[in-house]
């Protein structure tokens, strides 16, 4: 069966992976991404690119995957019973950057496409994706820049798109067991098929193409900020919360593991170092306390910037 939609999306995603790696490697200097191609026995494969022990990025990865099969994993079909009995293709690029300097935020993003088919029925398809920022020592102007790029990305598709997907991002990237957000949000969307295919695909491309514009200026502004053991310890502590979200709440991690995806690539998003301290709380009024007090609850960043 021909997959004209799938072929177009896959071509874009492979190109996006190349451009993301080139743009991020340009900030790093001597350390390069190494590529690891893999195949999935049940159908499909991918191309993982990882950077480690860099001067800027302590660890980072940009992963392309295309998996397919004759039946969906339980994590997908349980919530969507109409998908039962359908073959599927899932294709996407996901990326995460864990900088060495605690003043440079961690960043994550992905764009993906899913299609499920069966004989005699219309295909079921949708897009998903977004990007989100996780600072440890946040700077208001950085957060505003991040959200302004997100808003400008969404604007051609309707005035309601940024507020809706910004709110969805705040809700999705929440550690419910901690009652805090993972970071300062950005954009998140899933099950996007409310427009015709070409418009949905154009939106996905806009989101993927906007990431470097949103992130690289922040990296450049904060990379030279001095830090010491205290800041690195706090970074490791907050990275522990990042791990908690990925293993407890993230649907993409669950889908990847249940669908027989490649474990090394799925867990590529994990930070290189993390730590947990029993009942630790930052000193009131400290820069560390400011993160939770001011930044880990949803805010209307752009409205505040214009006030």
Curated annotation (Swiss-Prot):
Residues binding substrate, per UniProt: 94, 110-112, 260-262
GO cellular component: cytoplasm
Coiled coil (residue ranges): none
Pathway: Porphyrin-containing compound metabolism; protoporphyrin-IX biosynthesis; protoporphyrinogen-IX from coproporphyrinogen-III (O2 route): step 1/1
Keyword Cytoplasm appears in the UniProt entry: yes
Catalysed conversion reaction: coproporphyrinogen III + O2 + 2 H(+) = protoporphyrinogen IX + 2 CO2 + 2 H2O
PANTHER family for the chain: COPROPORPHYRINOGEN III OXIDASE, MITOCHONDRIAL, OXYGEN-DEPENDENT COPROPORPHYRINOGEN-III OXIDASE, MITOCHONDRIAL
Family: Belongs to the aerobic coproporphyrinogen-III oxidase family.
Protein name per its UniProtKB record: Oxygen-dependent coproporphyrinogen-III oxidase
Annotated organism of origin: Chromohalobacter salexigens (strain ATCC BAA-138 / DSM 3043 / CIP 106854 / NCIMB 13768 / 1H11)
Lineage: Bacteria, Pseudomonadati, Pseudomonadota, Gammaproteobacteria, Oceanospirillales
């Amino acid at each position: 069966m021909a997959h004209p939609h799938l072929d177009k999306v896959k071509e874009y995603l492979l190109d996006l992976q190349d451009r993301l790696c080139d743009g991020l490697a340009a900030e790093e200097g001597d350390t390069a991404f190494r590529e690891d191609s893999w195949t999935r026995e049940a159908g499909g494969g991918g191309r993982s690119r990882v950077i480690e022990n860099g001067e800027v990025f302590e660890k980072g990865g940009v992963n392309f995957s295309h998996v397919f099969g004759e039946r969906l994993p339980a994590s997908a079909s349980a919530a969507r019973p109409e998908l039962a009995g359908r073959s599927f293709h899932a294709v996407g690029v996901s990326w995460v950057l864990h900088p060495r300097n605690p003043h440079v935020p961690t960043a994550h993003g992905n764009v993906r496409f899913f299609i499920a088919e069966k004989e005699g029925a219309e295909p079921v398809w949708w897009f998903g994706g977004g990007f989100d920022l996780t600072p440890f020592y946040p700077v208001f102007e950085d957060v505003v820049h991040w959200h302004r790029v997100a808003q400008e990305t969404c604007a051609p598709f309707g005035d309601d798109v940024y507020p809706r997907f910004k709110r969805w991002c705040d809700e999705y990237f929440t550690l419910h067991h901690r009652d805090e957000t993972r970071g300062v949000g950005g954009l998140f969307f899933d099950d996007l098929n409310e427009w015709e295919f070409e418009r949905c695909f154009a939106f996905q491309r806009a989101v993927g193409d906007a990431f470097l514009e949103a992130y690289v200026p922040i990296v450049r502004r904060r990379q030279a900020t001095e830090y010491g053991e205290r800041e690195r310890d706090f970074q490791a502590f907050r990275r522990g919360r990042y791990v908690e979200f990925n293993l407890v709440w993230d649907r993409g991690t669950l889908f990847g593991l249940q669908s027989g995806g490649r474990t090394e690539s799925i867990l590529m998003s994990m930070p290189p170092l993390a730590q947990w301290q029993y009942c630790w709380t930052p000193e009131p009024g400290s820069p560390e306390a400011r993160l939770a007090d001011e930044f880990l609850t949803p805010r209307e960043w752009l409205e505040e910037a214009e006030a």
